[in-house]
């Protein structure tokens, strides 16, 4: 509480004024704050600064031929940030240090940078020091979750881009984190997705977006009209380990940042936390508002079989 008070004091002293009219809503991970005047709502600031943010680290031991992830680890750090805040929402009774221990910069931590690097190489042939994309990041989270049953959160990654299959999900125990790695355009987000993307922030199960700009990932947690608020991992602190923990202050951001929707990169990961059957039914009911971003089907289509009868003889080309 004292740390958050210091952050608020620091921010309110330097804060730009809010330019949106009174009555405008800020949507923050499924709930809202109403703008009353030119100032940001204090509860919104407090909740923003209370979020866990995991950034670049230096002095890391155990990484192959390197001691820092600065310059290449932002997608991993932003994905860790999404996962850490998801766990905090799911288990509010857990102490912050318990959650941070899962992401410690040491090989034994379940979701450490070491584990992501190892899994990235195993699953996607991504070498240490190479940038992760959304699909690689999601695949790593799912596999690491499977390998750590003591972490009380299951992960389901959408298939075929953005598809959730009910029969597959029914085999996963709650609570479950749904991760949807997708692309909403070519060089920028296609305007046809704007309304649905804005709607996602109003869904109660929404736990954030990882993405941002090409090779510069962030964690997005709130929006005001078409501006998105985000946490930025591009700040380097010294490594956090269980024996030498970093200052708690390095896991919170004292700066409010936002970017316009048209400036976002179209590649991103959507995260939704489903804690029980009731929340799943609520998610299904609301999916119609962002049906082009997340699709739900009963089961995955069977692959089409190819028979020899349909294979052209190589000599046919001579007669065409």
UniProtKB/Swiss-Prot annotation:
Subcellular location(s) per record: Cytoplasm; Nucleus; Preautophagosomal structure
Enzyme Commission code(s) on record: 3.4.22.-
Catalytic activity, reaction form: [protein]-C-terminal L-amino acid-glycyl-phosphatidylethanolamide + H2O = [protein]-C-terminal L-amino acid-glycine + a 1,2-diacyl-sn-glycero-3-phosphoethanolamine
InterPro entries, sorted: Papain-like_cys_pep_sf (IPR038765), Peptidase_C54 (IPR005078), Peptidase_C54_cat (IPR046792)
Keyword Protease: yes
Coarse class of the protein's main subcellular location: cytoplasm
Family, as annotated: Belongs to the peptidase C54 family.
Protein name in the entry: Probable cysteine protease atg4
Species whose genome carries this gene: Schizosaccharomyces pombe (strain 972 / ATCC 24843)
């Amino acid at each position: 509480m004292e740390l958050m008070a210091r952050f608020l004091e620091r921010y309110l002293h330097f804060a730009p004024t809010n330019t949106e009219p009174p009555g405008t809503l800020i949507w923050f991970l499924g709930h809202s704050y109403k703008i009353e005047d030119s100032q940001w709502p204090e509860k919104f600031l407090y909740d923003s600064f209370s979020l866990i943010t995991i950034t670049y680290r230096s002095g890391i031991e155990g990484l192959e031929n390197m001691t820092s992830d600065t310059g290449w680890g932002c997608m991993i750090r932003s994905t860790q940030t999404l996962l850490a805040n998801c766990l905090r929402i799911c288990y509010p009774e857990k102490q912050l240090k318990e959650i941070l221990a899962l992401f410690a910069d040491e090989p034994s931590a379940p979701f450490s940078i070491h584990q992501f690097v190892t899994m990235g190489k195993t699953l996607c042939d991504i070498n240490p020091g190479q940038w992760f994309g959304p699909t690689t990041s999601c695949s790593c989270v799912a596999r690491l979750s499977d390998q750590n049953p003591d972490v009380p959160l299951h992960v389901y990654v959408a298939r075929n881009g953005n598809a959730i299959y009910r029969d597959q999900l029914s085999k996963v125990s709650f609570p479950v984190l749904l991760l949807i790695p997708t692309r909403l355009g070519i060089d920028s987000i296609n305007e046809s997705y704007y309304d649905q993307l804005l709607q996602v922030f109003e869904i109660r199960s929404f736990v954030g977006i990882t993405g941002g700009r090409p090779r510069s990932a962030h964690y997005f947690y709130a929006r005001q009209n078409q501006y998105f608020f985000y946490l930025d991992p591009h700040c380097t602190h010294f490594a956090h380990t269980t024996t030498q923990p970093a200052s708690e202050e390095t896991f919170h951001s004292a700066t409010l940042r936002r970017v316009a929707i048209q400036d976002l990169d179209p590649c991103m990961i959507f995260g939704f936390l489903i804690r029980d059957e009731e929340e799943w039914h609520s998610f299904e009911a609301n999916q119609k508002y962002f049906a082009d971003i997340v699709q739900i089907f009963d089961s995955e289509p069977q692959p089409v079989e190819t028979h020899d009868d349909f294979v052209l003889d190589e000599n046919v080309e001579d007669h065409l």
